[in-house]
């Protein structure tokens, strides 16, 4: 079998397939399912200390965009992109972080990496989350 390993910013990843921060990485259960498929890694849903930012997830927006990146009206054309903005982790950091830790432990058995994602509205929040 071919060696698909990549080195990204000093992090060795067994293959270049990474499940990014979206619904597939919304919780530990989903991240583990991604890892089970053989991905090289997962990027956990962004966690934040801001309740207002977490509420964005409840107002997710999905759109079909045509080749000119315009929102499709009516029939979806043959060439299109599915664009989504789904927000952040629903739980506050103290509830979401244990799910990331659980996923990191699970990922070790599959030689997969788990990458965290954080957001805050203040410098102090960024420092505390990091």
Which residues are covered by each model-predicted region?
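Active-site entrance/lid segments in N-terminal catalytic domains of soluble metabolic enzymes
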Residues: 2-13, 18-130
């Amino acid at each position: 079998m071919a060696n698909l390993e990549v080195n990204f910013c000093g992090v060795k990843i067994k293959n270049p397939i990474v499940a990014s921060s979206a619904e597939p990485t919304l919780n530990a259960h989903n991240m583990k399912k991604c890892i089970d498929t053989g991905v090289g890694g997962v990027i956990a849903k962004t966690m934040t200390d801001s309740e207002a930012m977490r509420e964005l997830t409840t107002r997710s927006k999905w759109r079909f965009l045509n080749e000119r990146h315009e929102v499709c009206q009516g029939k979806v054309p043959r060439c299109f992109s599915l664009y989504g903005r789904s927000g952040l982790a629903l739980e506050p950091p103290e509830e979401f972080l244990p799910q990331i830790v659980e996923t990191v432990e699970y990922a070790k058995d599959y030689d997969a990496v788990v990458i965290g994602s954080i957001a805050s509205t203040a410098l102090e929040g960024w420092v505390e989350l990091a």
